[in-house]
Amino acid sequence: RKLLFRILGVTVCIAVIIFSLKNETFRILLAPSEWDFVTYRKIEYVMKLVVTDFHFDSFYVDLIATDLSSQFMTHLSTSLYLGLLGASPYILYELFRFVSPALYDSEKKYSIRMIAIVYLLFMLGVLMSYYVLFPISFHFLGTYSVSEKIHSTITLDSYISTFVTLTLLMGVVFQLPVISYFLGRMGIVDAKLMSYYRKHAFLIIMFVAAVITPPDLMTLILVTIPLYLLYEVSIRVVKIANKQIKTD
């Protein structure tokens, strides 16, 4: 019970701080909706090395609140979500403290490394979503039009929910090496088999990237490369896990 109260207390405190920093918080969250966001400028720079006249047209997408309480409730829920994200290192620390008395010294060291890797990979997924997947998806979907007579107006709820969904999705996807390690330790996955099906995996990754991103080549490349690198890392991780099985 004390553990839960400590976790809840830290999460709420961070959420309150974030809630009080309303302008700064939403300046960061809404930055990908601006046409001069850093991702668009970097893509322009890279593409101009290949296509000299490439550039992103300036765009503007209206964000609206349709309910009386929607802005407040979105502010509140976003603060809680970011509070939980900000408190996650402390939560992992408390959970480790809770189970550590039952662990051997070697298991404690192993657990600390695994927790650090899981957290690092999750945060890399969050950054991947913020700087690549979400802004490019927003640009495509927000400016897509079936007719000049139709003007896109997006609700704040839709914007934030999509942002959170993609962030969590990429955070989970980036756990592939960790999942592969445990599957390798259980003997379910073999490094040689993963290497043999490398080309098949690349095609599957490209298909998944094409589904979750706008249909343009640059976006496909930006999403496919890190996902495929995760697969390559997973092969090496599974190879280590397979060797550990033989030595155990």
Task: For each feature predicted by the language model, list its residue ranges.
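Membrane topogenic/interface segments and analogous intrinsically disordered interaction regions
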Residues: 1-248
